[in-house]
């Protein structure tokens, strides 16, 4: 099929499409026939192809929607869900979708802030749910491992923890987050100051490209490999697995929590934290969270991890950050894998097996983030505190994550994630609420407006030209493709430079080369060079 004919087919079926599963007509039926013929699905166990006619369809769809805000009847639904059991199944989906004009979303564990791993607007789409592709193979002697992208961070941590006490991997704090999206956008946790992002520690990958080929690092080339490690993998293909580099950790890790309920004291300590947290030795990570307690009063929580014993930590804190008042009684020594459980708020003594649980969150949320490059004034911290006292911030959080260390050592261009040296910390504003308590969406609007108001208030105090954002905290308020500008590139640049700064242009060039028909696209994907919207 010639490109012009193929493009016309895609455009034709992207117009006037209802979000209902039953309304997509013959091209969906042809897509399913293509899948069934190539996969011989009737003889495959477990079942791979799921449609709305199947009893499994909605349970599979809902099981990995990690933001209940999008688990409502109004949300567009896929025409089908495919749960591959082998790599060739993914190749088949891509080839059949290309042939029959079906858009594809790829879901690892469903934690996209805006639901774009299982939602598409105004076009028929299928979801590739990678839940069955979750094997993990570690090579402790060579400090490496292969991780399929249907696995979660918790499953990776579990395999590491049961295999070795001297190795770790620097990814996110929340164990239920999938490694597919997290690693392809960056991925950070308690080890980021020592070892950088998850993406910084990926040394190979297997990807299904727009032609349905399976490529490793050597076959895809260094530009392609660069793009998927921080540029958001969904713009470039379906990532099947990562080869990760494991990092060294000692037998003893120290963790601590210090809570401050006095506004005056907390504000004073946060002000000092801004000058210390990115400059202390990279063995130390101190995150600050502002939130409401059970008694509904705002408090500041300083949560830390030190790569080493408690006595060394206390000496360091006395020298670098005495204002926190850390005492030995507030610290606990443990192994790295135990610290993973501790940061995930599991009860003490819980078995490692809980890291493999895939429980779905019960709270809807909306989040935004910024990067802070100069300490914000005390008056601004006080105003943030005041805004957390609002009724709609009852379950809200403002999270300050320190950078520095390894994050400052790497250049902006080494991976697509550009927010490196010069950033003191990242600050995230998140509102949570219970969707079932707000049937008419009136309260939801209040929560969304609260996040917007905090974000607007912070404008003078955060990065500028561009105002940076983290692609893993995807925010549709930054913009989406609406066809209001001459080219998709012009639209995409408005938020692309916020996520990627100068790396956006290189990502566009890679995208144009490896996916010239823009098959792998969503409302905020990397555009082609001068593609007409």
From Swiss-Prot:
It is found in: Secreted, Cell wall. Glycans are attached at residues 142, 440. Involved in adaptation to salt stress. Keywords: Cell wall, Disulfide bond, FAD, Flavoprotein, Glycoprotein, Nucleotide-binding, Oxidoreductase, Secreted, Signal. Disulfide bonds join 34-96. The modification Pros-8alpha-FAD histidine is found at residue 111. Pfam families: BBE (PF08031), FAD_binding_4 (PF01565). One of its GO terms (cellular component) is plant-type cell wall. Induction: By salt stress, specifically in the root. Belongs to the oxygen-dependent FAD-linked oxidoreductase family. Residues 1-23 form the signal peptide. One of its GO terms (molecular function) is FAD binding. PROSITE patterns: FAD_PCMH. Its cofactor is FAD. This is Berberine bridge enzyme-like 28. The keyword Disulfide bond applies. InterPro entries: BBE, FAD-bd_PCMH, FAD-bd_PCMH-like_sf, FAD-bd_PCMH_sub1, FAD-bd_PCMH_sub2, Oxid_FAD_bind_N. Residues 74-249 form the FAD-binding PCMH-type domain. GO terms for biological process: response to salt stress. Disruption phenotype: No obvious developmental defects but reduced biomass and reduced leaves number. Increased sensitivity to salt stress. Its EC number is 1.1.1.-. SUPFAM superfamilies: FAD-binding/transporter-associated domain-like (SSF56176). PANTHER family: OS08G0158400 PROTEIN. It comes from the Eukaryota. It is an enzyme of class 1 (oxidoreductase).
């Amino acid at each position: 099929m010639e490109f012009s004919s193929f493009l016309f087919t895609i455009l034709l079926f992207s117009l006037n499409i209802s979000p209902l599963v039953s309304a997509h007509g013959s091209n969906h039926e042809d897509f399913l026939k293509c899948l069934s013929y190539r996969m011989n699905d009737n003889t495959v166990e477990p079942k791979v192809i799921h449609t709305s006619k199947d009893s499994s369809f909605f349970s599979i769809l809902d099981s990995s929607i990690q933001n209940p805000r999008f688990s409502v009847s109004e949300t567009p639904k896929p025409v089908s869900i495919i749960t591959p059991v082998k790599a060739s199944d993914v190749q088949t989906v891509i080839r059949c979708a290309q042939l029959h004009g079906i858009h594809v979303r790829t879901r690892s564990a469903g934690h996209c802030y805006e639901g774009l791993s299982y939602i598409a607007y105004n076009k028929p789409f299928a979801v590739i749910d990678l839940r069955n592709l979750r094997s993990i193979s570690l090579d402790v002697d060579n400090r490496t491992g292969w991780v399929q992208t249907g696995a979660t961070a918790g499953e990776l941590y579990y395999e590491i923890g049961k295999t070795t006490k001297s190795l770790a991997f620097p990814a996110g704090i929340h164990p239920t987050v999938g490694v597919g999206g997290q690693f392809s956008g960056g991925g950070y946790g308690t080890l980021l100051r020592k070892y950088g992002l998850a993406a910084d520690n990926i040394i190979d990958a297997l990807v299904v490209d727009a032609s349905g080929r399976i490529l490793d690092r050597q076959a895809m080339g260094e530009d392609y490999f660069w793009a998927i490690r921080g540029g958001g993998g969904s713009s470039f293909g379906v990532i099947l697995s990562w080869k990760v580099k494991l990092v060294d950790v000692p037998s003893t890790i120290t963790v601590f929590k210090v809570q401050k309920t006095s506004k005056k004291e907390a504000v004073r300590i946060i002000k000092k934290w801004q000058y210390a947290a990115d400059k202390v030795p990279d063995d130390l990570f101190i995150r600050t969270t502002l939130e409401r307690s059970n008694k509904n009063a705002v408090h500041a929580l300083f949560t830390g991890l030190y790569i080493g014993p408690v006595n060394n930590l206390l000496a360091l804190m006395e020298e670098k950050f005495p204002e926190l008042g850390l005492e030995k009684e507030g610290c606990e020594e443990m192994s790295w894998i135990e610290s993973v459980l501790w940061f995930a708020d599991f009860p003490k003594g819980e078995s490692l097996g809980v890291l493999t649980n895939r429980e779905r969150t019960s709270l809807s949320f909306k989040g935004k983030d910024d990067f802070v490059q100069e300490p914000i004034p005390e008056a601004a911290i006080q105003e943030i505190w005041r805004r957390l006292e609002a009724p709609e911030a009852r379950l809200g959080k403002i999270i300050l994550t320190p950078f520095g260390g390894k994050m400052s050592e790497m250049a902006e261009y080494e991976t697509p994630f550009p927010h490196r040296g010069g950033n003191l910390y990242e600050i995230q504003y998140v509102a949570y609420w219970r969707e079932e308590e707000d049937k008419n969406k009136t309260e939801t609007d209040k929560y969304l407006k609260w996040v917007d108001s905090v974000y607007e208030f912070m404008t003078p105090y955060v990065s500028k030209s561009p105002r940076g954002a983290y692609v893993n905290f995807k925010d549709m308020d930054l913009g989406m493709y609406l066809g209001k500008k001459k080219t998709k590139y012009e639209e995409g640049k408005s938020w692309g430079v916020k996520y990627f700064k100068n790396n956006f242009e290189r990502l566009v060039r890679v995208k144009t080369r490896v996916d010239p028909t823009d098959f792998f696209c969503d409302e905020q994907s990397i555009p082609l060079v001068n593609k007409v919207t």
